[in-house]
Amino acid sequence: MSVIKMTDLDLAGKRVLIRADLNVPVKEGKVTSDARIRASLPTIEIALKQGARVMVTSHLGRPTEGEYNEDFSLLPVVDYLKEKLSSPVRLAKDYLDGVDVAEGELVVLENVRFNKGEKKDDEVLSKKYAALCDVFVMDAFGTAHRAQASTHGVGKFATIACAGPLLSGELEALGKALSKPARPMVAIVGGSKVSTKLTVLDSLSKIADQLIVGGGIANTFVAAQGHNVGKSLYEADLISEAKKLLETCDIPVPSDVRVASEFSETAAATLKSVTEIKDEEQILDLGDVSAERLAEILKNAKTILWNGPVGVFEFPNFRKGTEIIARAIADSDAFSIAGGGDTLAAIDLFGIADKISYISTGGGAFLEFVEGKKLPAVVMLEERAKQ
């Protein structure tokens, strides 16, 4: 994967536009989770330190395109950046016809989704973004799978289009885990539905030495082995697909689980074998024997890819399976990469972020990369590197 890297360029005096992923949760005008901004700070700081005229932009939320809406303004992000950076920071609302930026100053360009044509990768809008800068830096891995004006179109028309350190790091880490993984390679795919992750399961079954399934996905595999899953979330129409995967890949299906009579935070957990599940019960977590068996597999792994929890970890009574898995990954010597919103929430909950080799900021982009799909923004950067 050959792209121009921002870190290889001299940015002094240049107008630099960074497309970051600053799509953070905001409540009452305050940023409530700063993980994505923190991840973007090093890129901004490198450009400022080099004496560039720095602009950064992002989308935030899902406003009606082409309309300004204060609820989706990047102003809370600007307030956050003012606290973290020693350089002056300001918000520019009207910038499409040009914006003055001083050396060593950071100008945040208001939410790109307020611009008509953003989502459709409009050429006129893309050219306006490109005219703002000498160097366009794509650093938002989380939106690299979308061909939009601020992630894709702008890069086609900018004088120079390059990958920022965050995007480069994501691509290198995923490449390391998927292209030439140290073996054994173990992949964990959790979540509620097989249907949404069937392509991922299929792709990983060809790469991984062992494929661990969890959550509602695992219930479909339990059912595929002929067990009653009661009222559990599962997909009867995908049992044949699950059987196919069981034949082609080593998938350790749970032998014991934690069940409840209702889907509720206060529901009592009962530990039982998968052969004993009653019609009125639903599986909400792995059992101890299954979780410890998986922990042992992870202990011996050399590469671990983790996407999705293995139980309803948001409920304290059904957290144990995910915690055992999370701690096994943290204790492993393997190169580990984790991605997806729920996975990141679990990592935060168990306080193991510093024990994971690489935490991906992308949800959909992470999955599409794992599926082997080409990400439009990355393809654009590769094409620009050839010119």
UniProtKB/Swiss-Prot annotation:
A Gene Ontology cellular-component term: cytosol
Q: What is its main location?
A: cytoplasm
A GO molecular-function term, please?
A: ATP binding
- Residues bound to ATP: 197, 314, 340-343
**Catalytic activity line of the entry:** (2R)-3-phosphoglycerate + ATP = (2R)-3-phospho-glyceroyl phosphate + ADP
The pathway is: Carbohydrate degradation; glycolysis; pyruvate from D-glyceraldehyde 3-phosphate: step 2/5
Q: Which Gene3D superfamilies match?
A: Phosphoglycerate kinase, N-terminal domain
| Alphabetical keyword list | ATP-binding, Cytoplasm, Glycolysis, Kinase, Nucleotide-binding, Transferase
Q: Member of which family?
A: Belongs to the phosphoglycerate kinase family.
- Self-association or partners: how does it assemble? Monomer.
In its UniProt entry, what is this protein called?
Answer: Phosphoglycerate kinase
Question: Whose protein is this, by species?
Answer: Pectobacterium atrosepticum (strain SCRI 1043 / ATCC BAA-672)
